[in-house]
Amino acid sequence: LMVVTSNADRICTGITSSNSPHVVKTATQGEVNVTGVIPLTTTPTKSHFANLKGTKTRGKLCPNCLNCTDLDVALGRPKCMGTIPSAKASILHEVKPVTSGCFPIMHDRTKIRQLPNLLRGYENIRLSTRNVINAERAPGGPYIIGTSGSCPNVTNGNGFFATMAWAVPKDNKTATDPLTIEVPYICTKGEDQITVWGFHSDNKNQMVKLYGDSKPQKFTSSANGVTTHYVSQIGGFPNQTEDGGLPQSGRIVVDYMVQKPGKPGTIVYQRGVLLPQKVWCASGRSKVIKGSLPLIGEADCLHEKYGGLNKSKPYYTGEHAKAIGNCPIWVKTPLKLANGTKYRPPAKLLKERGFFGAIAGFLEGGWEGMIAGWHGYTSHGAHGVAVAADLKSTQEAINKITKNLNSLSELEVKNLQRLSGAMDELHNEILELDEKVDDLRADTISSQIELAVLLSNEGIINSEDEHLLALERKLKKMLGPSAVDIGNGCFETKHKCNQTCLDRIAAGTFNAGEFSLPTFDSLNITAASLNDDGLDNHTILLYYSTAASSLAVTLMIAIFIVYMVSRDNVSCSICL
């Protein structure tokens, strides 16, 4: 009689378990519980505007020009002449249409209110030291350069804007056909040249008195492929100015043209022209955003709705608006990236009956105790359950998550560059994106980012199978012939494997020989003890073989007799 026993242990690969699951969204599995997450979004709160970190931020065009609007500075109002500091970012702080405190301007006729915005969009801005043309000797002259008491100079005498010359005919106060003057490019550093010009109109009496012609006058400017036409309005202006300045019966219309390096512009005019004088020379790019002054402190990002923001997450939810700097990107819903493994309750051994009732050893759930890692090994035996984390596998999983974060960051940068590029394309227009187009673009980018996060979560969760398969191959190689693969990532060892053994497996220092020699307790065969006197082993074997042979012969004879009877070849009679 043989009795077979086993002192083997079972070693399995496994995943950590957690009792605090989080939820992430995936592309195909919907919402999935995981052991940890990295929040990718934040919802900002409103704050004051600030200087943008790492760069110069411009508030007012001329900080030292007191009681001056940015339009005053842009037009060169006599008491508003000063240096405009260079800046990589600018705040459009005058949220309402702002007029000049000088001669009353008909703002609605032109895009003159956009002139300060245009200048804000340049990093470097300077006013030329010389006049672009000699206004007194321009065609249709000679002219007297007009001034106004509503535009006083620094000595409180009559003055006018430094960027324009009010050309009043000196002697020949008569009507004239359209005249043409070329405006040369005079900037010296390859800058854009912003040339300001305009025209004056009044009631009929004043038009005759100043220009000798009471009819509407025609004006045209052309530069850089852009041509603009105007016809002056005669009379009909309220006596009190919209600027709250001195009462004026007349008005001026002011416009500008942008001349590229080396390219001249032209102005076609009649009576009442305001000829260009000093010009703006501008270069570089400064990002513009609507905001408020003063600027307090520093911030990573300037947001039209939230003010100064310090970036803590790559994305934000809440109100979408234009922003500049190192800003999070707007998304519709909060986003989370999986930072761990798929949630599993504490593991149990499922006793599935296989061939001869063997335990299959399939593991369900995760194992508690893998404090230092997400993946690892478990050992089951007389010692109970031992658990050890595999740091290398865990690090590989973390590296994959980091790679996903970097990919999302690259996507963020590309989208920011796309938005920035779109803004630069409109730079020479008004430097403001159309809100509807901007919202549509933001929705599209938000959808792209959300899909990228869903796919990243899908990949992170699905990669668990890869990590476990790699662990299984590693475990099989280390155990070698000292264990039998029983499937589902489990191996039955021919030796004991307690916590020390498992820790060495996790550390990659396991040596099967070290555990097999002293601790091997392989299949034990215990022989039955027969105590008949005078019998040795050879005699016992002889008895066994004789009995077995006799039994075999008897069975063969019995089978032959039954066969012959069934064929009627042999008859059998039983008599009493």
From Swiss-Prot:
Maturation and modification: Palmitoylated.
Lipid-conjugated positions (S-palmitoyl cysteine): C572, C575
Transmembrane feature ranges: 545-565
Superkingdom assignment: Viruses
Intrachain disulfide bonds: C12-C490, C68-C80, C102-C151, C497-C501
Localization per record: Virion membrane; Host apical cell membrane
UniProt membrane topology term: Single-pass type I membrane protein
Keywords from the named record: Disulfide bond, Fusion of virus membrane with host endosomal membrane, Fusion of virus membrane with host membrane, Glycoprotein, Hemagglutinin, Host cell membrane, Host membrane, Host-virus interaction, Lipoprotein, Membrane, Palmitate, Transmembrane, Transmembrane helix, Viral attachment to host cell, Viral envelope protein, Viral penetration into host cytoplasm, Virion, Virus endocytosis by host, Virus entry into host cell
A single cellular component GO annotation: viral envelope
Residues annotated as glycosylated: N33, N67, N153, N172, N239, N310, N339, N498, N524, N537
Principal subcellular localization: virion
Site (Cleavage): R353, G354
Extracellular compartment residues: 1-544
One example GO MF annotation: host cell surface receptor binding
SUPFAM superfamilies (alphabetical): Influenza hemagglutinin (stalk), Viral protein domain
GO biological process, one term: virion attachment to host cell
Cross-referenced InterPro entries: Capsid_hemagglutn (IPR008980), Hemagglutn_HA1_a/b_dom_sf (IPR013828), Hemagglutn_influenz_A/B (IPR001364), Hemagglutn_influenz_B (IPR000386)
Sequence ranges on the Cytoplasmic membrane side: 566-576
Stretch forming the signal peptide: none
Subunit relationships: Homotrimer of disulfide-linked HA1-HA2.
Role noted for this protein: Binds to sialic acid-containing receptors on the cell surface, bringing about the attachment of the virus particle to the cell. Plays a major role in the determination of host range restriction and virulence. Class I viral fusion protein. Responsible for penetration of the virus into the cell cytoplasm by mediating the fusion of the membrane of the endocytosed virus particle with the endosomal membrane. Low pH in endosomes induce an irreversible conformational change in HA2, releasing the fusion hydrophobic peptide. Several trimers are required to form a competent fusion pore.
Similarity comment: family membership: Belongs to the influenza viruses hemagglutinin family.
Note: Major glycoprotein, comprises over 80% of the envelope proteins present in virus particle. The extent of infection into host organism is determined by HA. Influenza viruses bud from the apical surface of polarized epithelial cells (e.g. bronchial epithelial cells) into lumen of lungs and are therefore usually pneumotropic. The reason is that HA is cleaved by tryptase clara which is restricted to lungs. However, HAs of H5 and H7 pantropic avian viruses subtypes can be cleaved by furin and subtilisin-type enzymes, allowing the virus to grow in other organs than lungs.
Name assigned to this protein: Hemagglutinin
Lineage: Viruses, Riboviria, Orthornavirae, Negarnaviricota, Polyploviricotina
Gene encoding the protein: HA
